[in-house]
């Protein structure tokens, strides 16, 4: 079974970045998965476990170096990734909390994620809450006026989506025409 050399890792990184935007941590994870698959195949091919472990350690260090090289080259930019993803998620009705959690899961540093949420082009929390209401057909976008139990369920739905109580109440109380105008 051939070794995983730096060139193969570099090519794998380029192939991934050609198809997907990624963070440095995400790229390291992709390369790590490739190394893990190689190690599993090498073990099944009957290679010495000690030799496999040594190769995995060397390839893991090389993967970190490849990811760092991609950052230096500008192919990976965590701040740009965070800004674009925050804009997309908030525009789709995700709360600030849900967006921060998503960015953290993707490997974006907390300060970069917070800065991305403050960007000019990122919709505010109220706008995102109205989008969530429209997607779920609740609040101003409901077919009928809610009873007290229904309103409580809607508040619970928005709370589970990460919206604060004040923002959720304000969105649910917004008249339909005003909500549609805000989203237009």
Where are these regions (language model features)?
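An alpha-helical, amphipathic repeat domain used for nucleic-acid recognition
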Residues: 1-184
């Amino acid at each position: 079974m051939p070794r995983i050399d730096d060139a193969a890792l570099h090519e794998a990184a380029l192939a991934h970045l050609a198809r997907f935007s990624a963070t440095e941590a995400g790229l390291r994870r992709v390369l790590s998965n490739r190394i893990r698959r190689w190690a599993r195949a090498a073990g099944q091919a009957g290679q010495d476990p000690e030799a496999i472990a040594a190769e995995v350690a060397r390839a893991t260090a090389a993967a970190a170096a490849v990811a760092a090289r991609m950052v230096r080259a500008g192919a990976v930019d965590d701040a740009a990734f965070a800004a674009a993803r925050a804009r997309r998620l908030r525009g789709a009705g995700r709360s600030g909390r849900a967006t921060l959690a998503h960015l953290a899961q993707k490997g974006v540093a907390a300060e970069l994620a917070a800065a991305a949420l403050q960007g000019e082009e990122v919709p505010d929390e109220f706008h995102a809450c109205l989008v969530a209401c429209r997607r779920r057909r609740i609040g101003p976008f409901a077919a009928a006026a809610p009873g007290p139990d229904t309103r409580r369920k809607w508040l619970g739905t928005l709370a589970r989506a990460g919206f604060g109580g004040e923002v959720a109440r304000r969105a649910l109380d917004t008249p339909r025409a005003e909500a549609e105008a805000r989203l237009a």
